[in-house]
Amino acid sequence: MGLEVAADSVGSALAAQDGGAIRVELCGGLDGGGLTPSFGTLAVVRERLQIPLYVLIRPRVGDFVFDAAEVEVMRRDVEQCVRLGCDGVVLGALDLQGQVDLPAMRALIEAAGTLGVTFHRAIDVSADPARVLEDAIALGCERVLTSGARASALEGVETIAALVRQAGERISIMPGAGVSAANVQALRAGTGAREFHASARGPVAAQVHAPHPYITDLGGDYQRTDVARVRSIVQLLQTA
């Protein structure tokens, strides 16, 4: 039983570790759903993190239908993760019919070599989550991150539970989206899942001394993973 934390900065990754997370999913642009992190962020986090590090590979916002150039970008990002000694990558690609883009996924998984692979929330916008789960298993993925095809994992609890039953011992189903200390016990009881995914973020006040009177989207407050929030979720998961 454990918590994976989605972190989009060095500070968030280290806070996740300090709070007792079992793993970090490193990304960039978490407010937009998450993108591939910068090379610098990845390198520094890899140097400083002691717990397993998985890296989101997503070249842009929007859907998960990627053209050949985008798949090549993703493949090269995966290769960087291999070179830096990351523990795994987080992937997902769909075709125009909303099914798993098997050629793209196979190319990316081949590039990952011995790294672990999580299939991400592309399953939640797919045409058939149950079929996507079977494809993820066949591809050799370790786990699937899902909200149960709903805006939050709590709303998708019934679908997540069905995926957990379908998966059996073949693959881990990891609920994510809106997971917090307020609902993780209900999610645990309602789904039977054994690992969960959250950002556990809280607000950080801007350090600027004199906010600009006309610009509100630059230099303001931001969100960062909070050690106490991580610890609260972890402690609840450790409660029998």
Swiss-Prot record:
GO molecular function: copper ion binding
A Pfam family hit: CutC
Major location category of this protein: cytoplasm
Gene Ontology, cellular component aspect: cytoplasm
Signal peptide (residue range): none
Cited InterPro entries: CutC-like, CutC-like_dom_sf
UniProt keyword annotations, A-Z: Cytoplasm
Gene3D superfamilies in UniProt: Copper homeostasis (CutC) domain
Record's subcellular location: Cytoplasm
S-S bonds: none
UniProt similarity note: Belongs to the CutC family.
Protein's UniProt name: PF03932 family protein CutC
The organism of origin for this protein: Xanthomonas campestris pv. campestris (strain B100)
Lineage summary: Bacteria, Pseudomonadati, Pseudomonadota, Gammaproteobacteria, Lysobacterales
Gene name in the database record: cutC
